[in-house]
Amino acid sequence: MGIKGLTALMRDNAPGAIKEQKFESYLDRRVAIDASMHIYQFMMVVGRQGEQQLTNEAGEVTSHLQGMLNRTCRMLEAGIKPIYVFDGKPPVMKGGELAKRKDKREEAEAALKAAREAGNQEEVEKLSKRTVRVSKQHSQEVMKLASLLGVPVFEAPCEAEASCAAMCKAGLVWAVATEDMDTLTFAAPRLARNLMAPKSQDKPVLEFDYDKVLAGLGLTPEQFIDMCILCGCDYCDTIRGIGPKTALKLIKEHGSIEKILEEIDTEKYPPPQDWDFAGARELFKNPEVMDTTGIALSWKAPNEEGLIDFLVKEKQFNEERVRAVCAKVKKARQGKASQNRLESFFGPPTIISSTIGKRKVEEKKGKNGKAGLANKKSKGVSGFRRSKN
C-alpha cells in the first residue's frame, strides 16, 4: 500500500526533494529493486486481455516472466545494474493489512462471478485484476530468471523494501526502485519511481532524496515516521479524519503521536482501539533486514542455454526472441564495460516545483504519462496462450 498521500504532500511542501531524471541517466548505477511488488504488477497487466492472462501450454501463468524479462533486458541494455530483492516472511504487524487484502480479494471474486453472469465485460476486466495472487512459485521463477540473466538476487528476511533501503544506506546501491513510498519511511537515501515502467509510457524517473524530504517538510527522521503512520501505512490503522496535510501540521506542532493524542479532541478524532503506533514506529526504525556487510555484488553474462531450457523448453517462450534478448544483453555488456558516468552528457535533472493551488515543473515539464501500467500492454517475448484467471 505504501504511505497514503505522501507523494502529493512532498510535491506541495518539499518540491526540491523530487527530481525528474531520464532513464538513461542511470547508466552504471546500481539499483536495488523491490521485485515482489513488481511481480504483482506484471501479473495484473502484462499481456492481459479482459480477464485472460498469458500462460504456457500447461496453463501456467507467465505474465510475470515476460514482464521481468522485458524490464531487466531494458535496464541491462541501458547500462543499469539491477539487484532484485524478494520478500521474506511478512512482519506480524502486517497481519491486519494482509487480512484486509484477503477480504477484498474474496469480495472481488464474488463480484467477478456476478459480473460474468451479467455479461458485464468492463466489470469483469476490472475485477479480475483484483483477484490476482502472487505465489511462492511465481517468486521462485522470477528469481531463477534473474539469476540466468546474470543479475544478483536476494531474499530478504522480511520486507524486501526494508532490505533495499538498508542496501542503499550501506552504499551498496545508488537508489531503491519501487512504487511504494514507505521505502522512504525506512530511510532509504534515494527512491526511484517509474524506473520499471515500460518504455512505451515514456515516463520520467522520479527520484526522491530522503534528506531533502526531511529538510523540506521540516521534520526529524522520527517525526517523519510518525507523520507517515498518521497518513496511513501497512502496519496499523490511523485516526479517521486526519489526512496527510493535517498529519504534517499536527506533527510539526506537537512533535510526536503521543503529544498529539494529549492535545486533540479524541471524541472528534478517536484513535483506533488498541492502536499500536509505537510498534509500527519500531518496525520502521529497526526493521528486520539482511546483513549488508560482506556483500559482493557482481553481474554476469546471461546463461543463454539455461534461459533456453527454462523459458523455451519449459515455459514455451519464442526461442528466436529469447536468443535475441541474450544477444542484446551481451552486446550491451561489451559496450558499457569501458563507459564512465557522465551526468553532464544527459543534461541537468528537472526539479519539481510547487505553487499555491497547482503543481508545475520548474525547468521543463515532463510528459504527463496519464496512462498507467494497467492501461498499456507490454511488448516482448511472445509464444503464450491465454487463460482465464
UniProtKB/Swiss-Prot annotation:
Q: Which organism's genome codes for this protein?
A: Ostreococcus lucimarinus (strain CCE9901)
Where in or outside the cell is it found? Nucleus, Nucleolus; Nucleus, Nucleoplasm; Mitochondrion
Its subunit composition reads:
Interacts with PCNA. Three molecules of FEN1 bind to one PCNA trimer with each molecule binding to one PCNA monomer. PCNA stimulates the nuclease activity without altering cleavage specificity.
Which cofactor is recorded for it?
Mg(2+)
Q: Where is this region: Interaction with PCNA?
A: 338-346
EC number(s) reported in the record: 3.1.-.-
- Name by which UniProt lists this protein: Flap endonuclease 1
- What PROSITE patterns does this protein's entry cite? XPG_1 (PS00841)
Q: Which residues bind DNA?
A: R71, E159, G232, D234
Read off the PANTHER family from this record. Answer: FLAP ENDONUCLEASE 1, FLAP ENDONUCLEASE FAMILY MEMBER
Tell me its family.
Belongs to the XPG/RAD2 endonuclease family. FEN1 subfamily.
